[in-house]
Amino acid sequence: MKSKVSKFYEVKIQYQEMQEDGKEKRVTEQYVVEALSFTEAETRIIEEMTPYISGEFDVVSEKIAPFNEIFLSNNYSDDKWFVSKVAFITIDEKTEKEKKQTFRYLVQAATSELALDYTKEMLSHGMSVYCIDAVQDTPTLDVFLHEV
């Protein structure tokens, strides 16, 4: 497992896909793109998807992703994307009350159970007290990162 901290965008594209019965169907797919701006995210998704889609496609939605860190797996069978919602717990020194600050992480895994295990593994290196509130499947099909 490795971690990538950056700015990410969720980008949805639409295109006509030929079905097995010969009919065309309008398909919407979601991807995550590492980019510095909406313009760069749109340019990157067009560059990445053009070789795989015959015909035209449209970028129909772009939004800043609700996470800024991705946990990437080295395992080839981990082909799905999950969002782990994690609450970090601290004590407010003035009021002496417990405070929770929630963060979301995009996790590459084969199952939600494995995504939970990966999240625990990646967070185990820190000293913070945390609670994993949820691990949810996402419609994200792939993630496009900057090449180093």
Regions found by a protein language model. Give the residues of each.
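A cross-family "folded-core" feature that marks the main globular domain of proteins
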Residues: 8, 14, 23, 44, ...
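A cross-kingdom feature marking solvent-exposed beta-strand/loop segments within repeated
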Residues: 17-34, 51-54, 97-105, 125-132
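A short, charged, amphipathic alpha-helix used as a generic interaction element across diverse proteins
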Residues: 37-53, 111-126
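Short, mixed-charge low-complexity intrinsically disordered segments
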Residues: 50-91, 125-148
